């Protein structure tokens, strides 16, 4: 409508001013941009001249390690989050104190970035894939806890109340009536989180948490983009293959 367009036009000066202010706040300088843009030749000349033999020989094992980190972390994180989610849902936890404790715990974990967890665990247990697994366990647990607790909030409470009326204890009623309702969602969330962990495990390697990211960071330091580019392609192929497998498995199960 004309009124809607008028409101948009009125807000344009504010949006432009906010954009300009943001440029200054992040330290954007057109002269620095032009000067640094000249360095692109160093990147493009090597980036598009990939060393495939080197990448396959040196990065294949690390890529497999990345996938293994994601598998282990997503399994552990999601299954730890499963019981926690019931305690963090009003539908299955009627005790306000414990509900707030578990809900706050999951919120706290979710607010901390996975990179921080990786840096924390590399200090605690040392560099390597074990630190990456622990970091992604926290990452997976936080996401699954949020998604699943919100799903539990919307379940049909009829079977739960019927189980309690027939004499079942609260935990028994939850196990027999609430759990079956959320298992399809749990499976879908697990596959989604596994895909996220594949991508995240690559990034965590940049801070020494194992996987192929460690090799990428080492080659970046030496400006060997000719070795980085084929590794990125290998990661892309692996991610696409895993996503397709995930879609196929989701259709079969759900």
Question: What do the predicted segments below correspond to?
Answer:
Residues 123, 199-235, 254:
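Glycine-rich helix-loop "coupling/hinge" segments at transmembrane-helix boundaries
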